[in-house]
Design a protein with these regions (language model features):
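Active-site-proximal cap/loop segments of hydrolase catalytic domains
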Residues: 491-687
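Beta-propeller folds
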Residues: 1-383, 389-395, 400, 473, ...
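Structured core elements
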Residues: 187, 241, 253-254, 286-287, ...
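Secondary-structure transition/capping motifs at alpha-helix termini
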Residues: 103-105, 145-147, 157-160, 176-181, ...
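Glycine-rich His-Gly loop
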Residues: 88, 290, 389, 459-464, ...
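Active-site lining segments that contact anionic ligands and/or coordinate catalytic metals
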Residues: 237, 249, 275, 282, ...
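Flexible loop/turn segments at secondary-structure boundaries
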Residues: 92-93, 147-148, 194-196, 226-227, ...
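Cap/lid segment of the alpha/beta-hydrolase catalytic domain
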Residues: 115-129, 142, 146, 402-405, ...
Length: 687
């Protein structure tokens, strides 16, 4: 295929360039017809260039489908009165939700058909589903555009007519425990002008069919523009927990779940830099916090007023406590080892006096792997549901009997086709970064090719303390079967090695992320895993920032790069507090009102560091309704790199005009988009 530089005569960039606006800021005007025309032209250029690869994309897509079990049924969950599950038909994008009275499966009925809700909608995302305490009413939120502004609906189960309650709210909704025959209270969040969930509201929902709509009551409004409000309910069903938090500070308030109209109770007042989460068992609260150190410790206090916090699990230097789940019998803790970047589930059984009866770790099937505690609605459950997966092992669900220790396999995602998971091998190597820090790099490949350098897809993220723990991908098998190695650079800024790893890759230390990613690339070559001239870099969202910066600095390091809804115009975005997310991101990137911060961000912001040089082939994806990374960021980057390109490699932009930050909502379109992206990757790798 002949590559075409983006500035050839007649290209969108050449046709729409404005000499009076060389930075392409005019693309930020969503109402302009020229903007729509430019994006349409770029999409057409993308389609024209891609046309010869369409047969390969079709092959990848259908091969991917053949590997999957397209008809999917979730595990059943028995609540107090009914058992619930979802089923997705082999030809369906969306599921149906089913239930039956406990012990009477012959009386099953579909109570919510997502297919009907999504019909004739170009985009559909269900933000949340919440069952009333008696399990006879369903509240849910839905977004039909992709801009993450949700509408609240209600219906009686199983076949009531849906009633729209509210629009323009946050995705989550929570029932209080005050239900009567007449109604119950729902809690939800609303946005300010920058789409920050700044307020918590309660609404009395009358169940009578023609009951008048009540006016929502404000519970809490958060004035600090860096703080977001959220609400949830403890597994004990005793308390509603309200968090108002920034990226590094949390305030926790509470309401008795059966008395949501009472005054808020403060469980932890905000302290700058102190993050907190709270859970509950009868008579006691638990507090996970970093007040005494960056790796968190666990405290407890009596439920009574003015009780003081007492340490239960002390801060450690070699592991970070990442989460706590309370049950009647004790706690499950998520604990991340800094040495091997592995999360362990720790079981802590407590007696009625809160003394430790048992302290042990739940066994892992292999390392590295991901082991997660599935949400269990039963506070007194003596059986836990675990989800486990790795780079070579598809997701499996187990029931762990706490009394006998017996693990029972409940479900495993089936994988069909010629490449079985058993034919894969994963390994971890360590890259030495510019300052001597050892950066973990995970790799998965075909076992029969593990002794030779391979074409490689290198993925990275490195922000917000998010950890890229091992995950299995059926779509990834299309690349692996064709001889590609898939590698993940666990760069600083992520959470793979605990809170210090995150802190070492944010704010003034952000440069470490970029050094780490390039060091990972060098380590893969030095370890004879990767062929130096056949490495594609890939990153999404903040990972797009990582990749965008690295291709500016070392374009020769990669034969191509994939930037999916990439955060590229960092300085300009952070200088505009009217955009969604900006003020909440000050603690991640810094506030550029300070000249030194602006200078620092300008030093790496991808769009501000484009140079006339030979760029690798670029596949850039944006979304029109994206409220996290505005469509114009990838569009401007595409335009300016096209102008700067000194080589022949293509610079391609595709903007999805019917979705948001998460891409397509229907699974078949999402899989087809993945196949197109993979076709580009294989082309770039010469496969």
């Amino acid at each position: 295929m002949k590559a075409q530089p983006g500035m050839h005569e007649g290209s969108p960039v050449a046709r729409y360039y404005r000499a009076d606006d060389p930075e392409w800021h005019w693309l930020e005007n969503r109402e302009s017809a020229d903007v729509s025309d430019f994006l349409t032209a770029a999409n057409q250029q993308h389609a024209d260039w891609f046309a010869p690869l369409s047969p390969l994309a079709d092959t990848l897509y259908h091969s991917h489908l053949a590997r999957r079990e397209l008809a999917v049924k979730s595990l059943e969950t028995a609540l107090d009165h009914f058992t619930f599950w979802s089923e997705t038909g082999a030809e369906d994008d969306y599921p149906c939700w089913w239930r039956y009275p406990n012990g009477q499966p012959e009386q099953k009925s579909c109570f919510f058909d997502v297919r009907e809700r999504a019909a004739e909608q170009p985009f559909y995302d269900m933000g949340d589903m919440a069952l009333s305490p008696d399990e006879q009413w369903l509240a849910w939120t839905e977004d039909t555009q992709g801009d993450e502004r949700f509408t609240l609906w209600l219906k009686a189960l199983p076949n009531g007519t849906p009633r729209q309650l509210l629009s323009d709210i946050g995705p989550s909704v929570c029932w209080a425990e005050d239900q009567t025959a007449d109604g119950a209270t729902l809690l939800f969040t609303r946005f300010d002008d920058t789409q920050r969930p700044d307020s918590l509201w309660r609404l009395w929902v009358a169940f009578a069919e023609h009951a008048p709509m009540q006016t929502p009551t404000l519970v809490l409004r958060e004035a600090d523009p860096e703080f977001w409000v959220g609400v949830g309910k403890t597994r004990s069903k005793a308390w509603l927990i309200i968090e108002s938090g920034s990226k590094d500070t949390t305030e926790v308030l509470a309401l008795p779940a059966d008395q949501p109209e009472t005054p808020l109770v403060c469980l932890h007042a905000r302290e700058p830099g102190v993050e907190v989460s709270i859970d509950h068992r009868p008579g006691v609260f638990y507090r996970l916090h970093n007040q005494t150190g960056p790796h968190f410790q666990l405290d407890m206090r009596a439920e009574s007023d003015n009780a003081s916090w007492q340490p239960l699990i002390a801060h450690r230097d070699d592991a970070t406590l990442e989460g706590v789940d309370a049950f009647e019998w004790g706690l499950i803790l998520a604990e991340r080892s800094h040495q091997d970047a592995q999360v362990l589930l720790r079981r802590l059984e407590l007696d009625s006096h809160h003394q430790t009866l048992l302290d042990s770790y739940i066994e892992l099937p292999e390392t590295p792997c991901s082991q997660l505690l599935e949400d269990s609605p039963h506070f007194n459950a003596r059986t836990l549901h675990l989800r486990e997966e790795s780079f070579t092992r598809p997701p499996s669900w187990y029931a762990l009997d706490l009394d006998s220790g017996v693990r029972t396999l409940l479900k495993q995602v089936p994988v069909h086709g010629s490449l079985a998971p058993e034919q894969l091998v994963s390994r971890r190597i360590w890259a030495t970064s510019h300052d001597g820090e050892q950066v973990p790099v995970s790799v998965v490949m075909r076992a029969d090719l593990a002794d030779q350098p391979l074409p490689t897809l290198l993925y990275g993220y490195g922000a917000y303390g998010e950890a890229l723990d091992p995950w299995f991908s059926i779509a990834r098998l299309e690349l692996l079967e064709r001889g590609v190695a898939f590698a993940v650079a666990h760069v600083r800024g992520g959470g793979e090695r605990g809170e210090p790893w995150y802190l070492a890759g944010k704010m003034a230390h952000k440069e470490n992320s970029f050094h780490d990613f390039l060091a990972a690339r060098e380590a893969l070559v030095a370890a004879h895993i990767s062929q130096p001239e056949r490495i594609v870099a890939c990153g999404a969202s903040a990972g797009g920032l990582l990749v965008g910066t690295c291709i500016n600095r070392a374009p020769e390091a990669f034969c191509a790069a994939v930037l999916d809804v990439p955060f590229l115009d960092v300085l300009r975005t952070m200088q505009n507090p009217e955009l969604p997310l900006t003020t909440a991101e000050y603690t991640e990137w810094g506030n550029p009102e300070a000249p030194d911060v602006a200078e620092r961000i300008a030093g790496y912001s991808p769009i501000d560091n484009i140079r006339s040089q030979r760029y690798p082939a670029l596949w850039i994806e944006g979304s029109w309704f994206d409220t996290r990374v505005s469509y114009w960021e990838p569009a401007k980057f595409y335009a300016r790199v096209s102008q700067a390109q000194q080589g022949a490699a293509p610079i391609l932009l595709h903007t999805d005009m019917s979705s948001g930050h998460g891409g397509a909502s229907g699974r078949f379109k999402a899989w087809r988009d993945t196949a197109r992206q993979d076709a580009f990757i294989l082309w770039a790798l010469g496969l």
